[in-house]
Amino acid sequence: ENAEIQCIPTFIAPKTTHIKGKSLVLDLGGTNYRVAIVDFDKATPTVHPNNGWKKDMSIMKSVGYTREELFKELADMIIGIKREEEMPIGYCFSYPAESVPGGDAKLLRWTKGVDIKEMVGEFIGKPLLDYLNERNKIKFTGIKVVNDTIASLFAGLTDNSYDAYIGLIVGTGTNMATFIPADKIEKLDQSCNAHGLIPVNLESGNFHPPFLTAVDDTVDAISGNPGKQRFEKAVSGMYL
């Protein structure tokens, strides 16, 4: 749990065939928030509108920012979307979170300058789902939460010509994910009944490289979380 590289399993099996239906997709990153509806009724997924809706979420980094304020910001864009049917939500959440069977996740800590303390240790998906369903006449049927690296990892599976995959993010922050055989992950709870390849969020931004310089030490010292995310602070957009 306190390891430098946490290797957080995700209990959502990827699918590359027989996918059908529509889903609302949310992407909350270190800087931007994006919303779109994805239609899987054809061989190639269709995004409506073409590039989705986008909003700058730098306000999340404000001192004293609350969960209620965050949920309202997220909901305001969703309420404006015209839907004629119920659908599930896929939530790409770009912060360290512990995935649980069923598709939700618990926030472990904030990174990238965000610090909404009341959300740490709490579920990410279900409270947002309840909040949205209280404010939408046409309900959402469920929610699945994945890290942005896991989403990138799954996207790579659309090209099946490779024998190994890595989901890499280098943006406001940095992180990566990959597939690891379930029998090699000793910390997996036996009740999960996991088998085959498991998508794992490495949380590699917390790696502490041995080659950092005095400049890196200065950046770390004046950051909001000294001693943590040292690799991220050395290479990602927020700190560069």
Predicted regions and their residues:
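Charge-rich, low-complexity intrinsically disordered linkers/tails
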Residues: 1-12, 47-48, 54-55, 107-109
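Glycine-rich phosphate-binding loop and adjoining helix at the ATP-binding site
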Residues: 52-72, 97-159, 164-166, 184-206, ...
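Phosphate/pyrophosphate-binding loops at sites that engage ATP/ADP/AMP, CoA/4′-phosphopantetheine
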Residues: 74-88, 132-137
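Gly/Thr-rich phosphate-binding beta-strand-loop-beta motif of the actin/hexokinase/Hsp70
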Residues: 11-48, 80, 99, 165-182
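Active-site core segments that coordinate phosphate-bearing ligands/cofactors
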Residues: 11-15, 153, 158-170, 174-240
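Charged, flexible boundary elements
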Residues: 1-17, 143-147, 151
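Short glycine-rich phosphate-binding loop at a beta-alpha junction
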Residues: 23-24, 85-94, 143-144
